[in-house]
Swiss-Prot record:
Enzyme Commission no: 3.1.26.4
This protein's GO CC annotations: cytoplasm; ribonuclease H2 complex
Family: Belongs to the RNase HII family.
Enzymatic reactions: Endonucleolytic cleavage to 5'-phosphomonoester
Limits of the RNase H type-2 domain: 2-184
Name of this chain's protein: Ribonuclease HII
Residues of the signal peptide: none
Cofactors demanded by this protein: Mn(2+); Mg(2+)
Disulfide bonds: none
Task performed by this protein: Endonuclease that specifically degrades the RNA of RNA-DNA hybrids.
Pfam families with a match to the protein in the record: RNase_HII
Length: 184
């Protein structure tokens, strides 16, 4: 059986910040791997260190401006195409149900089933979270370190009070009903 290159992303549904897409080929077994959303932040950091020391990986970032210009689907397609070219001798498994025309294997919930995809999930999440923690220092009023750019009540409240920052995705529209019930 061919060695597996797992791919997953973080930040897909966020209102601010980048989309982080990671590809990972594990060179040794790492215990405790799972979908990054099912792990604590502390455990993700521990596993991130192990993964980066014992695997081949790439992480692609797409800024909020690139997401606004290209759209999420095109950003994902470009990352998958890059990873397919870089890891061409591996079986590539992407967590999801769309291959974006790239010709790779997709698997729903692969981040909880395939070790390489779990590792990619952790790489994407931890690297993006670290970026959001850094951006929190430039935009403290928005609380990025807490919600990581996702549409929590506190984030929606900050947008209502301060407007969009340069780090927000302008193409992501907050639905009026949600804005009225959550923002005011």
């Amino acid at each position: 059986m061919a060695k597996i290159c797992g791919i997953d992303e973080a930040g897909r549904g966020a209102l601010a910040g980048p989309l982080s897409v990671a590809a990972c080929v594990l060179n040794s077994e790492i215990s405790g791997l799972n979908d990054s959303k099912k792990l604590t932040a502390k455990r993700r950091e521990e596993l991130f260190k192990k993964i980066t020391k014992s695997s081949n990986f790439l992480i692609a970032y797409f800024s909020n401006a690139q997401i606004d210009e290209l759209g999420l689907s095109e950003c994902l397609r470009r990352a998958l195409k890059l990873f397919k070219a870089h890891f061409e001798s591996f079986e590539i498994i992407y967590d999801g149900n769309l291959d974006y025309g790239v010709g790779i294997t997709t698997m729903i919930k692969a981040d909880g089933k395939v070790a390489g995809v779990s590792a990619a999930s952790i790489l994407a999440k931890v690297s993006r979270d670290r970026l959001m923690n850094g951006w929190d220092k430039f935009y403290p009023a928005y609380g990025f370190a807490g919600h990581k750019g996702y549409g929590t009540k506190s984030h929606l409240d900050a947008i209502a009070k301060f407007g969009y920052s340069d780090f927000h995705r302008k193409s992501f529209v907050i639905k009026p009903k949600l804005a009225q019930s959550s923002l005011f």
